[in-house]
Structure formats: C-alpha cells, structure tokens
C-alpha cells in the first residue's frame, strides 16, 4: 500500500469514527460537529483518490461551518451526562487528527510534485483546524472538573 492509499484509508477510518460518535449523542451541536467532521474526512479521501487517479479536484475549506456549529453545543454538563466517556472520545479523536497531521507533514516533506505539495499543505491546515476543535472540546469538558478541584487557587478564565 502506498502513502496515498494509506492516507485515503486513514481519512475513511476517521469518517467512520465521527459518524459513530454522531450517532452516540443526542446533543444537536455535537451531532452536527461530528457529521461535519465526517463529511470533511470524506472530502479529503475524495481529493486524495482523485489525485491518485489523475482526476480533477477542488480544495475547499469548510472549517467555517464547524466554527458556526460549535456555538450550538449544549451545556457542557449535558455533554458529560450524554457521553460519559466524552473526554476519552475527544482525546482519541485528537490523537487521530495529530497522526493525520504528522503523516501529511511527512508526505509533504518527501514530495517534489507541486500538485501534491498543494494537497498536503491544504490537508495539513485542515487537520490543524480539526486538532484545535478537539482541543476546545477537551477543554470544555475538562474545565468543570478542574474548576471544582482548584477553585481555591484564584481567578479562572471565563468559558
């Protein structure tokens, strides 16, 4: 299996992961985020497949949709109730996104093809934005616990 095929499989695995998580929550905002991330992973796989087959493709940044959906997420306490292992899920998703980011960076470093460079640079930025989103979800779920555990130690950032 070559690196492009590996990348396609990784994107499709991520799509499956996000669809499973979308089905496991009742929170509309989280469901929307997971569905949007699944669609983005599907788009990434299509871009890579088109490039591998020398077909045309378009690099479209859809991260703005996720930022808008993020505002729809319900109360963080509800998220913890609905998905007891939410922190584990987000940490796993973050690790997966980081692996993708590292893989695309390696592929970028190893290619001399201008078209491949553009694709990998695009995918690196996409994966970075996914990492940021997961970090925000981790912080949102973690902060209530941290706040209670360390409330005596002073002023906390608002969230």
Language-model features: where?
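Iron-associated oxidoreductase/ferritin-like identity signal
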Residues: 1-159
């Amino acid at each position: 299996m070559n690196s492009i095929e590996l990348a396609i499989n990784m994107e499709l695995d991520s799509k499956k992961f996000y669809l499973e998580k979308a089905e496991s929550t009742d929170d509309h905002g989280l469901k929307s985020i997971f569905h949007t991330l699944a669609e983005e992973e599907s788009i990434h796989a299509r871009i890579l497949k088109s490039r591998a087959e020398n077909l045309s493709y378009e690099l479209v940044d859809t991260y703005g949709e996720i930022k808008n959906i993020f505002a729809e997420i319900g109360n963080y306490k509800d998220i913890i109730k609905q998905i007891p292992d939410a922190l584990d899920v987000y940490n796993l998703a973050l690790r997966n996104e980081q692996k993708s980011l590292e893989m695309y960076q390696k592929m970028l470093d190893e290619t001399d093809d201008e078209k491949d460079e553009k694709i990998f640079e695009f995918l690196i930025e996409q994966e970075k934005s996914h990492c940021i989103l997961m970090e925000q979800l981790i912080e949102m779920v973690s902060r209530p616990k941290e706040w209670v555990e360390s409330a005596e130690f002073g002023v906390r950032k608002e969230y």
